[in-house]
Amino acid sequence: MNRRRRIYEGKAKILYEGPEPGTLVQFFKDDATAFNAKKHEVIDGKGVLNNRISEHIFTQLNRIGIPTHFIRRLNMREQLIKEVEIIPLEVVVRNVAAGSLAKRLGLEEGTILPRSIIEFYYKADALDDPMVTEEHITAFGWASPQEIDDIMALAIRVNDFLTGLFLGIGIQLVDFKMECGRLWEGDMMRIVVADEISPDSARLWDITTNDKLDKDRFRRDMGGLVEAYQEVARRLGIMNENDTPRPSGPTLVK
């Protein structure tokens, strides 16, 4: 499609003006970042895989009645989405101890949590996205108490769905991050799932081997990120079985 006016550029995506009022085009970049972009490389093919995987997940969420901003995929790197007012919070749902939770609480990575835990982080790169409580959220007006309830209800439903989806293809959903936005339809407003859900924003471990199939491969310098994302896509049925990773591995552009 013809390139339109750029609205916003983040670490992994660019938002462009959409073809119709109330729509945007979301472009998936090949940039891989970690630790709030303190670590950064460009990995050829990552954006294409995230676009396809996120499309698959959001299509399924829409199908089972979980509202999202997703309309349809336009091409290999772009999606048509509904324009929403993003709530400045990262919502993290944790099922297994890993990453910052394991470090913060002294838990062994891989420990199954007593129940799923929902955490909120304020979206501010300059502050390293600090963890915040519901008190912070309401005091600073980032979301109302009712909106927090709606966000938590969505998070629980998405977690239930994703846990089952990935379990069915031999993958354990360790944790994931999602974002929400306010979708205005006339005088009515509702909270919907926005941004993306992909191996960039979820920890995915092979159930049998515990191999990491997510962005931890980049965070921890393990290599094989594109191959891991391809494996997730293959198991989800959105890549042909005979598609194989390039023997030379992903191309890194410094």
Swiss-Prot record:
GO BP field: 'de novo' IMP biosynthetic process; cobalamin biosynthetic process
Ligase is among the record's keywords: yes
Keyword annotations from UniProtKB, A to Z: ATP-binding, Ligase, Nucleotide-binding, Purine biosynthesis
Species the sequence originates in: Brucella canis (strain ATCC 23365 / NCTC 10854 / RM-666)
A Pfam family: SAICAR_synt
Coiled coil: none
Entry EC no(s): 6.3.2.6
Family: Belongs to the SAICAR synthetase family.
Full protein name: Phosphoribosylaminoimidazole-succinocarboxamide synthase
Any one GO cellular component localisation term in the record: cytosol
Catalyzed chemical reaction(s): 5-amino-1-(5-phospho-D-ribosyl)imidazole-4-carboxylate + L-aspartate + ATP = (2S)-2-[5-amino-1-(5-phospho-beta-D-ribosyl)imidazole-4-carboxamido]succinate + ADP + phosphate + 2 H(+)
CDD domains according to UniProt: SAICAR_synt_PurC (cd01415)
Gene Ontology MF terms in the entry: ATP binding; phosphoribosylaminoimidazolesuccinocarboxamide synthase activity
Group of enzyme by EC: ligase
Pathway in which this enzyme or protein is active: Purine metabolism; IMP biosynthesis via de novo pathway; 5-amino-1-(5-phospho-D-ribosyl)imidazole-4-carboxamide from 5-amino-1-(5-phospho-D-ribosyl)imidazole-4-carboxylate: step 1/2
